[in-house]
Amino acid sequence: MLLVFRGETALSDFRRLPLLARCQTLWPNLDDLTTEYFFMVHAKRSLDAAEQNQLRQILGAGPEAPSQKSNQLAVCPRSGTISPWSSKATDILHNCGFDVVKRVERGIVYTFLSAAQPTTAQLAGVAPLLHDRMIEAPTRNVESLFEHIN
């Protein structure tokens, strides 16, 4: 079972504003962009409401994340890899009694604000600016990160 929770703002204005300026060189009518962490939790079974609340509290997460919109792009660790953050966070959850969690991973969702809906070409154009291609990959399907886990 996969749960996806919203997190806090991922980039401070110090990091976000220069990124916005670089994106605007490729996408001139881009007005703004926002960033938000999200947490993907792969659990062995469904979690009840109390377990979900406790899990959100440990992660510092908000409510379940809505499905990805057409003006958003998520950046996650590359498929088939486990980030150092994931290893440590999963260990912490297990030490807190959450043995039901197989793995937890963190990503960033970038939301692009523009008068017009972004095209696939625009999203593909700015994607290389958003991630380190050695360890991360942009995705429109966060569920694919856990496809190889049984």
Question: At which residue positions do the language-model features occur?
Answer:
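Core nucleic-acid recognition elements
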Residues: 1-150
